[in-house]
Amino acid sequence: MHIQEFHQALADIGARPCHIGRINRAWLKGLPLDAGTRHQKSEDYFPLSVREGLAPIAARIEKLARIHSRHDADDGSLRLLVGLGDGQMVESVLLPRDGLCVSSQVGCAVGCTFCMTGKSGLLRQLGSAEIAAQVALARRIRPVKKVVFMGMGEPAHNMENVLEAIQWLGTDGNIGHKNLVFSTVGDARVFERLPQLEVKPALALSLHTTRADLREQLLPRAPRIAPAELVELGEAYARRVGYPIQYQWTLLAGVNDSQEEMDAAARLLKGKYGVLNIIPYNSVEGDRFQRPSSERVQAIKRYLHDNGVLTKVRDSAGQDVDGGCGQLRARAAHVIDASRLRRREQAGVSAG
């Protein structure tokens, strides 16, 4: 469902814009659609036709998304496996300090080699109301003051629905614009569209390396854009909107954590209006990638910080409960990594 469909359904039962606005705000707070306020009961505000017609609309909205399972983690995060109306599932993560990570697609077409979500490919887009429904569900559990589009999917590949959800969350959802974070691998359309929006979100760019050839290997179906050009575009956006870019770097032991890479990262990012989030890879059994040691991660952070790059370590939330993006859904949906299966079969043949 799209947000416009929701609004049209409300208009069809006689809701005026002022009524639709109140219903929007109630839903995005995680409240019933007919919730009143401290100063005015719903029966004193909504006309009879709206009060009588809300129940079937509320039932449709409830079917958009439901919590299939909850997984509490030791770090204070709460991973939610969210079931959609057609039986598909996506992940949302309630983060410490009132944040929420939401999904924008079922699966993903980019196929990042270190990401579980890409193993299944792209199954379908989420509608704007399905994206917002993740926020409504989460707010029934605890406050949400920041929403990051870093869950399943590439937001730029579902641009219209994501931007519609951002507009809604940044107005009726009462979330500050810089607390809405649009994450992308570097789709050129992002840098054209986002500056034109009324609600201009913060931007997170998937960098992962300073080497164009390695980035093509790690992100095989991402736009062919050199890391230096990506940073240049990010810097221009950051200066325009007035809040820093987040650069994402998933640390893979022996792949992109060398001293040579860190030297290049320092040269590329020093003095830029941004922060580098280094994310130690969330290893899974039998995977070809491994996370660097804690000592190496801290050494990288210190080195970059000492060389003029604001650097933070961002572990995937919920390391003890399938913390990497897509891992929880993969376990529930029995998603198989074909390359890992082939390696196991080859190992079995060799052993025989």
UniProtKB/Swiss-Prot annotation:
The Radical SAM core domain, residue ranges: 94-320
Active-site feature positions: E91 (proton acceptor), C325 (s-methylcysteine intermediate)
Q: List the disulfide bonds.
A: C101-C325
Q: Which protein is depicted?
A: Probable RNA methyltransferase CV_2253
Its chief place of residence is: cytoplasm
> Mind listing the GO molecular function terms for this protein?
4 iron, 4 sulfur cluster binding; metal ion binding; RNA methyltransferase activity
Binding annotation for [4Fe-4S] cluster: C108, C112, C115
Its taxonomic placement starts with: Bacteria, Pseudomonadati, Pseudomonadota, Betaproteobacteria, Neisseriales
Instruction: Write down the species.
Output: Chromobacterium violaceum (strain ATCC 12472 / DSM 30191 / JCM 1249 / CCUG 213 / NBRC 12614 / NCIMB 9131 / NCTC 9757 / MK)
Cofactor, how bound (note)? Binds 1 [4Fe-4S] cluster. The cluster is coordinated with 3 cysteines and an exchangeable S-adenosyl-L-methionine.
